[in-house]
Each structure stands twice: as structure tokens, then as C-alpha cells.
Curated annotation (Swiss-Prot):
May play a role in photosystem I and II biogenesis. Its main location: plastid. The gene is psbN. This is Protein PsbN. HAMAP family: PSII_PsbN. The keyword Chloroplast applies. It comes from Hylocomium splendens (Glittering wood-moss). It comes from the Eukaryota. Signal peptide: none annotated. Keywords: Chloroplast, Membrane, Plastid, Thylakoid, Transmembrane, Transmembrane helix. GO terms for cellular component: chloroplast thylakoid membrane. GO terms for biological process: photosynthesis. It is found in: Plastid, Chloroplast thylakoid membrane.
Amino acid sequence: METATLVAIFISCSLVSFTGYALYTAFGQPSKELRDPFEEHED
């Protein structure tokens, strides 16, 4: 394979894995530990 192809595949896999981790953090098990600043400061 050419170097450009390997770099493109690496960058694509990195972006997909980062997006998956961000979605897991936002909506998965760790989301229960996130605080909601709007809920803390009710008017």
C-alpha cells in the first residue's frame, strides 16, 4: 500500500474511534457522572 493510503486510513480510524468514545461518554454509562449546570442553578 502507498503511504498516503495508510495515512488516510489511520486518520479515518482515529476520527471514528474518537467519535465513538465521545458518544459513549455522552450517552453511555459515564454520562450518569456528568453534572448539569442548568439543573444546579434553577431560577
